[in-house]
Amino acid sequence: MVKEAVKIVAQNKKARHDYFIEETIEAGIVLSGTEVKSVRQGKLNLKESYASIVEGEVIVSGMHISPYEQGNIFNKDPLRDRKLLLHKSEINRLIGLTQQKGYTLVPVQAYLKRGMVKIELGVARGKKLYDKRDDIAARDAKREIDRKMKEQLR
């Protein structure tokens, strides 16, 4: 079985740092032609982006796609809201999940799959400061253990 080629264009590392990602879902995105060309060049930033559900549609706000150099009049506003493509049942499930206290939708990564731009949306719960410190401590401990194991194997 041939594995599909997926090219990751952008990741939202801040989302993984600030939130617990409970569940992820893949969604298509509505883009203009020059925006697709810009995304293929990797000129996409998810750092300050978030998703919301408005009138039964999932909208991504704050996602920055740099204007395409040769796009001139066809370029759109880099920070405009963009619609995500999901089935109605998926949107209804997301509505149910995000209505719980403390949950939100955050774009985790953007990638190209079979020539199409896809967004991985995460149903996320905010981290407290002590949760972030625990993650940093666990990461440092794992790094120290790996270092000791490497020294023992020499």
From Swiss-Prot:
GO CC annotations, alphabetized: cytosol
Function: Required for rescue of stalled ribosomes mediated by trans-translation. Binds to transfer-messenger RNA (tmRNA), required for stable association of tmRNA with ribosomes. tmRNA and SmpB together mimic tRNA shape, replacing the anticodon stem-loop with SmpB. tmRNA is encoded by the ssrA gene; the 2 termini fold to resemble tRNA(Ala) and it encodes a 'tag peptide', a short internal open reading frame. During trans-translation Ala-aminoacylated tmRNA acts like a tRNA, entering the A-site of stalled ribosomes, displacing the stalled mRNA.
Organism: Ruminiclostridium cellulolyticum (strain ATCC 35319 / DSM 5812 / JCM 6584 / H10) (Clostridium cellulolyticum)
Disulfide bonds: none
Superkingdom as given in the UniProt entry: Bacteria
GO molecular function: RNA binding
SUPFAM superfamilies associated with the record: Small protein B (SmpB)
Gene Ontology biological-process annotations: trans-translation
Main localization (coarse): cytoplasm
Protein family per UniProt: Belongs to the SmpB family.
NCBIfam families recorded: PRK05422.1 (NF003843), smpB (TIGR00086)
Protein name from the UniProt record: SsrA-binding protein
The keyword Glycosyltransferase is assigned to this record: no
Compartments where found: Cytoplasm
Keywords from the named record: Cytoplasm, RNA-binding
Keyword Flavoprotein: no
